[in-house]
């Protein structure tokens, strides 16, 4: 089994996305985010092309349970622990990257 992000501090953040961003946003279950992160066809940007600091990694993968692509943002700390920072339904740009268009 491959490593998955630790969502200890961010579970509520991704699972209650629509409360912060509006009803058009999709809440993301941790299980969906992990499934997308482990997708064998996932596309990874290290560093994340949208990162201001260059410390985060963007992984775009498919979640069968959700039925759509999910973008997962992770960060490794100084102890090499993998933390989930956020996850959201992939936008059009990330979908194109995943489909290699």
Label for each model-derived stretch:
Residues 1-101:
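Ribonuclease/tRNase effector modules and their secretory precursors
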């Amino acid at each position: 089994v491959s490593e998955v992000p630790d969502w200890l501090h961010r579970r509520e953040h991704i699972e209650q996305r629509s409360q912060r961003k509006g009803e058009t946003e999709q809440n993301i279950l941790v299980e969906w985010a992990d499934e997308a992160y482990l997708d064998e066809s996932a596309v990874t940007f290290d560093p994340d092309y949208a990162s201001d600091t260059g410390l985060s990694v963007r992984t775009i993968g498919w979640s069968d349970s959700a039925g759509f692509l999910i973008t997962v943002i992770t960060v490794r700390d100084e102890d090499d622990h993998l933390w989930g920072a956020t996850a959201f339904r992939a936008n059009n740009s990330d979908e194109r990257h995943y489909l290699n268009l």
